[in-house]
Amino acid sequence: VLVCCIGLLCGPPAAEATKRVAPHGSDAWVDAQPGAASSLSRTPSSVADTTETQRPVVTGVRFDGGDAFPQATLEGRVRTTANRRFLGIPGFTWWVWLYELGDSGRLGDRVGQALKSSGEPPALLDETVLASDVERLEALFQQEGFREASVEARVDTTDGGAKAEVTFVVESGPPTFFREIQYEGLQTLSPDQRRRLLRESAIPAAGQQDTTLRFRADQRRYSEPLLLEERRRLLTFLRNEGYAAVTRDSIRAFVKRAAPDSFDVDLRVQTGPRYRFGDVFVEVTGPEAEQGGRRDTLALGEGARSGRMIVTIEQERRLRPSLIRRALRFQPGGWYSQEEVLNTRRRLEATGVFGLTDVTTSIPDSTAAPRAPEIAERLPQSIRLRTQPRHRVRFEMFALQRSGALGVLDNELGSGLGLSYNNLNLFGGGEAFQVGLSGSIAGDIQRQILTTSQLEASTSLQVPYLIQPFSGLDDRLGLFDARTRLSFSLVSLRSPELRFAIRGRGSGQLRLEMQHTPTVTSLVDLPTVSFSNPDTLAGFRRDILDRLIGSEDNPVIADPVQRAQVLEDYTQPQFNNAFRYTLRAANVDPLRRQQGFSYEGVFEVGSHLPYLLDRLVLSPDTVSGRLPIGTGDGLLYRPYIRLIGDARQYRPWGRHGVLAGRLFVGFAQPTGPSNVVPFDRRFYSGGASSVRGWRLRELGPGSVQSFAEGSSATGETNLFGGDIKLEASVEVRRTVIRNFLAANWAVAGFLDAGNVWFGPSNPGFQTDDPDQATGKF
C-alpha cells in the first residue's frame, strides 16, 4: 500500500505574524494570513435559548458576496439548510408535514414510522453547525486564493422567533495568484521526459516552456486543490516512467510569497531509483475441487528485455496460460509503468473468466544496499486470479409491445420465453460462447385475438483479442482494449392477422472491437451478411395489400413506381452483405446522462459482393440485380453506401437540471442497377426516440401525401422510408421532487425537428402537378 502526503509550506514576509492551521478537507498545511476574525452574529430577535423546543426553523439560506464561486458550490459547503419545498412553492414543505403526521402517533406506530422515513424533520437551527459552516466557507475561500477572506453568519428571525433565515455574508478580499513554478530533484529525467512533464502540468504556463523545469504561471489564481491535482499528476507521471517507489511523501511543495498578490511554488521531489519489470508469477485458483495442480513456465521476450512467466494453476482444468500471456501489457526488462500494470489488470477482468483479479508489484526495502546507478533493479510482478464457473444456463420470461405494424395493427401486446446457455471459457483462451432460443406470441389488445408468433435462435462467440490476420493491430495501434465477436441469428415469424410470414431471416456478423482510449472506440464489421425470405398467406392481397396500397382501379398509393417498390420490399427474398466502420467517442454515463458527450460516425458499404458476382461471374454481359439462388426470380440485392453522424451533448442546467442536445444526419445512396437502397437500410422518422410529436415511422418522405385522398388507410405509416434524414432535438430535464417514494421525480421539456426525404437517385412520387410534393430532398 502506497501512503501519500504532500506538504505545502507558505513563507510569509518576516515582518508579518504567522499562524499555521489545518484547513478542512485537505491533507496539507497552509499558512493562514492574518485577516478579519469570523463571527457568528444574530439579530436582536434571535433566539437566545437553544433548547429543542425553542430553536427556530430554518426557512431559507442565502449568500451575500462570494461571487467567485457558483451558488451550488457554496451550498455544498454548508450543513445548515432549509426544508425541501414541493415544486419550489414557498411554505409548501410537504415532507415536514409527512414527518409530523407520522410523529404524532395518530396513525399507529408502523404507519407512523413509514411516514417519518418518507418525510423529513423540521430543519431546526443549530448554532454549532452554523459555526462549522462559517469555518468551512472561510477554508474554501482561503484554499482558493482569497487569503484575507472572512465570513459572517447572520440570523434573521420572524414569526415571534419561530422561523429563521440564515445569511452568510462573505468578504472575499483580493485574490492571490501563482507566479513561478519550479520542479527540483528531477535532474535525472531526459529532455523528452521533462518536456512531457511540463506540457501536461495542471498549472498552465504563460509562455513557451523549455527543459529547465521552471516556468512562469499564466495568471492562474492560487488554489490548494490545484496543487493537490498537480501532485497527483506528478506521481502518476513518475510511476509511469519507472519510479515505482515514489509516494506522496516524496513530494513537498514549498509555497513562498513573492508579492502581496502572488506566490512562488517549489515542488521538491525525491524520485528514488528507476526500476524495470521483472519476472511474472501467476497463481490461479478455480472452482473444480477435484482437479489437481499444474505448473507452466513461459519465456517472455528476447535479449535484455526478456524474462519468465511462471503460472501455477489449481482446481482448474480448462484455462490455458496463453490467455494470461496475451493480457500482459508489459514486458520483463522494460521500464516499470503503473499504467501498464493497471491495463494488464483491466484486460484480465475484461475477459469475463476471472471473478478475482489482483496484480501487485514487489517494491524492495529502501534500506537494502543500493545498486550501481547504471544497473536498474527488476521488480517481480505477482498476479493472483480466481476463475468463475464456466457453465451458466438462464431461463427468462419477457413481455413485448408493438404498434403500427404496416399501418394495420394499432397495438400488440405479447409475452415470450427464452432459454440461453453460456460458456465463459470454451477453449481455454477466454472464448465466451453463447447460444439462445426464444419464442413469443402477441395479440391485438382491442380485438383480443392472437396476431403474431415468432421464434428466434442466436449464437455468438466472443474472444478477448483480435483474431488473425488482425492481431498485429493491437500492438501497432497501442489499443486500450480489443476483442472479436462472431454472431449468427435466425428468425421465423408468422402473422395470420397480417396474412404475412417470414420463413427465415438470418444474419451473420464478424466484428472487431478496438478501444483506442477509455472514451474512443472503433467497431469494424467485416462481412456482415443478411438474408430475408418473406412469404404471403392466403388473403394477403385482399385484406392487407389492397388496404395499404389499393388496387389498380382504386389506388391508395397512386404512383405505380412506388407501388411496385412496396411490393418488392415486403414480398421478395433479399440478400445483403456489408462492410461497416463505426467510430464512437463518449464519456457520458449511459444511464444518468447528466454531463458529457456521445459522438458517433458510421460509414457502410453494402451488397457489393453479390454485385461483383452478378457482373463478373454469373451474368457478365448484364447486371440483373438478382442472384439466381433458390426458386422464382432469385435473391434481390441492392448495392449502396450509407453515412451516419450522431452527436449528443449533456450539460448541467442549474443544480438539479440537465440541458441535452442531439443532432442526427443520415445519407444513403444506391450504387448499382437499382435506384433505391434496401428497405432495412433506409431511414425513418417519428416515434419516442425520434421526433416525438409523431407516431413510429409516421413522418415523411418530405411533405408528400403518400396515400390517395379518401383512402381508408389509417396511421399512414411511412412504408417507403427515406434516403436522407435530418433531426435535431433540444431537451431540458429538471428534478422537481427528490427522494419521494424512494425515487427522484423529474419533468422534461423538449423541442424536436426532423424528417426524411428521398435521395437524388430515388425517382420519388411522379406527378404532373409541379406544385405537388415528390418526397425528394
Spans of features found by a protein language model:
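Periplasmic polypeptide-binding modules associated with outer-membrane biogenesis and secretion
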Residues: T18-S403, E412-G414, G436-Q448, D474-G478, ...
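Secondary-structure boundary elements
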Residues: F237, E241-A244, T517, A586-Q594, ...
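C-terminal transmembrane beta-barrel domains of outer membrane proteins
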Residues: E16, A327, T351, F398-L400, ...
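Gram-negative/organellar outer-membrane beta-barrel architecture
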Residues: K19-P23, R196, A202-Q209, R317-R318, ...
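Bacterial N-terminal signal peptides
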Residues: V1-L9
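Residues at beta-strand starts and edge strands
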Residues: L2, R55-V57, R147-A149, A162-A164, ...
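Extended amphipathic secondary-structure runs
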Residues: E127-T157, L235, E340-V341, F500, ...
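Bacterial signal peptide processing site
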Residues: P12-P13
